[in-house]
A protein has these predicted regions:
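A short acidic, Gly/Pro-enriched loop at the edge of an enzyme's catalytic core
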Residues: 52-63
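A short glycine-rich, Lys/Arg-flanked "PGG" loop and its adjoining helix->strand segment in the class I
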Residues: 77-89
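Class I SAM-dependent methyltransferase SAM/SAH-binding core
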Residues: 1-53
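Conserved Rossmann-like nucleotide-binding pocket used by diverse enzymes
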Residues: 20, 47, 65-66, 94
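A short SAM/SAH-binding and catalytic strip from SAM-dependent methyltransferases
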Residues: 63-75
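C-terminal alpha-helical "lid/dimerization" subdomain adjacent to the S-adenosyl-L-methionine
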Residues: 94-152
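Short conserved AdoMet
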Residues: 14-15, 74, 88, 135
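C-terminal lobe and adjacent flexible extensions of AdoMet/dcAdoMet transferase-like proteins
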Residues: 152-158
Length: 158
């Protein structure tokens, strides 16, 4: 969920949706909550937690959105499994994150700066490895890249 800088304004356009935001960082969650309060969002709830051990029932969500998270998650496989578990049959998993191998300069920066600060944690997906991983779980997968970022939309089988 992060600070909500990209999502909170979007959520204002979805007044009938029930939106649940989860982040491991209390600081990030606090910043997102402040943005939601300033926008008077009444349909958004916040919960601190670990994407690798989601505190929700199987099939609890119609849509799971993950923006710029997977390159930072410490246990990526657990995150993929948990997201699949909490997504209802026919639900949509979408998002974006850094993938290695698309931009040498970005790869260098990730290794020498972001990893050292703890913002990114290896191992990283490549576009090819992500496509294979998602196609094993989901009935339909669409993905593309913009420089070193991959975006994807996946549909879980009914």
């Amino acid at each position: 969920m992060g600070t909500g800088i990209l999502t909170m304004p979007l959520y204002k356009t979805l007044p009938k949706a029930d939106i649940t935001c989860l982040d491991y960082s209390a600081d990030m969650m606090g910043q997102a909550q402040e943005k939601a309060d300033r926008l008077h969002l009444k349909n958004v709830t916040f919960r601190q937690g670990d994407v690798g051990a989601l505190p929700y029932a199987d099939g609890a969500f119609d849509i799971v959105l993950s923006l710029n998270g997977f390159h930072a998650f410490p246990d990526k496989e657990a995150a993929y499994q948990e997201i699949f578990r909490v997504l209802r049959p026919g639900g949509t998993f979408c998002g974006c994150f850094y993938v290695k191998g698309e931009q040498k300069r970005t790869d260098w920066f990730v290794r020498h700066v972001y990893e050292k600060t703890g913002f990114f944690t290896p191992p990283y997906e490549t576009t090819f490895s992500l496509k294979k991983r998602l196609e094993k779980r989901y009935a339909a997968v669409t993905l593309g890249t913009v420089k070193s970022m991959v975006w994807f939309v996946c549909q879980k089988a009914e």
